């Protein structure tokens, strides 16, 4: 995409390309560049991080090892995997409002609608606007040579062109985690065993999604094991839940169109129809498609993704990618492009295929007005996961399911726990895909600040909001572009606040960070509290007192927070639990109680509401109305902690549940 010189200037510096946005070139063209924040990776996260630093009045640069700006958000992923859209705040939310404004031709405002489907060039235009308004320089073709540390701090990073970047704070916003690795921060790759974190859907997972549903032989000569296996197929599969080093498959998110001016799918150099033998056999067995998705993003174009047992995912082609050199990654990129272009050529042209499949595929082509410098082909490989940091807080399946709740949230995630297939295996003489997991979650959940900064002592001035600390399956939920932007803004905010306070990222006051994040529109709690609303969960660290014995459980759904508690249907009259909220102001509040329902619950639970006028006792039936806020009435309360709600168990006829209370002013 062209960059008008009236808006910005482009310089070439020893092989690096620098885009200057309103900042004198001499300040950044030097051999040594010094700023307040150096951001590695011009992904959507990297852009947002630098913009946030500039909005906080500090200088920042983005250094990018490649030549593409915007990562997947401008690289073909135009149908945003957003989950609970209302939980997307801050600059991420602004980005999607700016997308809508671009299409509508209207100014963007804090109340503008958001749009989550878009053409790649529109996303690029929005990022250009953000960078230009903030005055953020972007350096391209900056590949790390050395990372220098003094004790636990990075002092500078040097590029292979000899240029040096210095700052008090650094951020790794790449999909690969190279800066994190060079800085000596602990990381992992591949899949943990379920036993590592007490999970249920990590490790090897032989399941039914994107699976061969018709019999296909894995052998070079169909049906003959003695002929050997076709390339890319493993002879056996480990038990579900077993750890390994495999990662979920990569592909390109193609921007396709059926417009008359579309670019036909090219036949790549090195094309070999034998690479698609499994697909040919699947079609012979009776499979008729679909072979890829065609989700509309506007302008008559699509965001096209993997779909089915044999599609655009190059399963097994990426195992070495996370730790590969830049040159080796370039080769992996090229191989993925050859594979996927060859697939589309095969589907559109191979004379053995039914005419209906060939004509349906050939009715699509690459959009001629997208990715114009690469022939309509996406310049960004979909790196679904690479390295993942291992820090003081590892996000796991338990966070995704809200069985645990981070006490130091810096943003929300809400997408399905999603892993694409990781390998092809032989099961009972037939080929099967392994690794695809698609498990829903209850709703938006918080991401811990400790998961985006290294463990204390490893590196004190580096934040890692993309390759954050998470298990393989939790990362499958977190790894969405809106979440990366959210976490990057929070990380940049932390970096600037820590610099101002002269403390490490690990020592930064979380209440101070949270206050600034909320002021900047970040969402740190879900559901979002309404004005005058106070919710107190049974798992809260203060405000909940117990008598007798209460047991934690998650066996019945509909609870608020990470769990609920019950009296085990014993010690009636002895077991009691009191919620004592801290109310911000005196006045009338409607009081709500929440529980989970079951036939074994008590139908006659006495609940004492302690208010300014005395004590009012209500009786609730916990066999019904579970998973919702049930009103106990409206009462007057003093400010502070004079009021409370007491659950009693005397003479109750079943399990008594304590989950959460809610006070709503007015």
List where the protein language model places each region.
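Short, surface-exposed beta-strand/strand-loop-strand elements in extracellular ectodomains
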Residues: 599-614
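Extracellular carbohydrate recognition and processing domains
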Residues: 613-639
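N-terminal secretory signal peptides and thylakoid transit peptides that target proteins
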Residues: 2-17
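A short beta-strand element within beta-rich, extracytoplasmic domains
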Residues: 577, 583-598
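Beta1/beta-strand and adjacent pyrophosphate-binding region of the FAD-binding site
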Residues: 33-43
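Short beta-strand-plus-loop segments that form exposed binding edges in beta-rich domains
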Residues: 646-654
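Conserved N-terminal/central alpha/beta ligand/cofactor-binding core
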Residues: 58-59, 64-146, 150, 188, ...
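Flavin (FAD/FMN)-binding glycine-rich loop and adjacent Rossmann-like elements that form
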Residues: 163-169, 173-529
């Amino acid at each position: 995409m062209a960059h008008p010189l009236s808006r910005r200037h482009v310089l070439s510096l020893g092989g690096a390309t620098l885009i200057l946005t309103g900042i004198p070139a001499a300040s950044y063209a030097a051999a040594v560049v010094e700023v307040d924040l150096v951001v590695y990776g011009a992904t959507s996260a990297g852009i947002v991080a630098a913009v946030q630093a500039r909005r906080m009045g500090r200088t920042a640069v983005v250094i990018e090892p490649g030549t593409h700006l915007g990562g997947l958000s401008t690289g073909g992923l135009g149908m945003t995997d957003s989950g609970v859209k209302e939980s997307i705040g801050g600059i991420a939310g602004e980005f999607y409002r700016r997308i809508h404004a671009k299409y509508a031709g209207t100014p963007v405002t804090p109340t503008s609608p958001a749009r989550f489907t878009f053409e790649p060039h529109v996303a690029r235009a929005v990022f250009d606007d953000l960078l230009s308004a903030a005055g953020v320089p972007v350096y391209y073709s900056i590949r790390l040579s050395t990372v220098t540390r003094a004790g636990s701090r990075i002092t500078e990073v040097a590029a292979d062109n000899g240029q040096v970047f210095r700052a008090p704070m650094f951020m790794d916003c790449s999909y690969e985690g190279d800066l994190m690795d060079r800085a000596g921060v602990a990381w992992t790759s591949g899949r943990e065993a379920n036993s590592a974190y007490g999970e249920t859907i990590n490790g090897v997972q032989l399941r039914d999604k994107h699976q061969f549903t018709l019999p296909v032989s894995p052998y070079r000569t169909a049906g003959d094991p003695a002929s050997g296996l076709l390339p890319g197929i493993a002879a056996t599969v480990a038990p579900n839940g077993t750890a390994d080093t495999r990662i979920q498959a990569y592909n390109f998110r193609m921007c396709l169109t059926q417009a008359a001016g579309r670019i036909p799918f090219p036949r790549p150099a090195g094309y070999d129809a034998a690479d698609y033998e499994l697909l040919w056999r699947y079609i012979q067995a009776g499979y008729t498609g679909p072979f890829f998705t065609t989700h509309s993003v506007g302008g008559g174009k699509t965001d096209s993704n993997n779909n089915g047992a044999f599609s655009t995912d190059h399963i097994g082609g990426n195992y070495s990618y996370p730790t590969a050199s830049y040159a080796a990654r370039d080769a992996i990129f090229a191989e993925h492009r050859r594979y996927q272009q060859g697939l589309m050529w095969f589907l559109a042209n191979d004379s053995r295929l039914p005419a209906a499949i060939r004509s349906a595929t050939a009715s699509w082509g690459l959009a001629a007005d997208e990715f114009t410098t690469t022939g309509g082909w996406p310049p960004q490989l979909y790196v679904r996961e690479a390295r993942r940091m291992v820090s003081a807080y590892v996000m796991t399946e338990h966070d995704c399911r809200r069985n645990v709740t981070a006490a130091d949230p810096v943003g929300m995630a809400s997408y399905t726990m999603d892993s694409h297939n990781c390998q092809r295996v032989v099961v009972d003489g037939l080929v099967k895909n392994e690794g695809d997991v698609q498990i829903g979650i209850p709703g938006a959940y918080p991401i811990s600040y400790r998961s985006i900064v290294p463990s204390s002592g490893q590196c004190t001035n580096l934040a890692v909001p993309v390759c954050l600390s998470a298990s393989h399956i939790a990362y499958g939920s977190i790894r969405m572009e809106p979440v990366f932007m959210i976490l990057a803004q929070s990380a940049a905010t932390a970096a600037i606040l820590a610099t101002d306070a002269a403390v490490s990222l690990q020592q930064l006051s979380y209440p101070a960070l949270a206050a600034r994040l909320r002021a900047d529109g970040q969402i740190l709690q879900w559901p979002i509290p309404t004005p005058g609303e106070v919710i107190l969960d049974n798992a809260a660290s203060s405000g909940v007192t117990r008598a007798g014995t209460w047991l934690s459980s998650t066996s019945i759904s509909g609870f608020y927070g990470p769990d609920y508690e019950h009296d085990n249907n014993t010690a009636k009259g002895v077991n009691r639990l009191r919620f004592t909220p801290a109310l911000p102001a005196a006045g009338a509040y409607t009081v709500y109680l929440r529980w989970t329902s079951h036939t074994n619950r008590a139908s006659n639970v006495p609940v004492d509401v302690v208010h300014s006028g005395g004590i009012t006792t209500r009786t609730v039936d916990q066999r019904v109305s579970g998973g919702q806020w049930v009103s106990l009435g409206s009462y007057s309360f003093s400010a502070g902690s004079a009021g409370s709600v007491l659950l009693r168990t005397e003479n109750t006829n079943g399990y008594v549940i304590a989950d959460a209370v809610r006070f709503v002013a007015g």
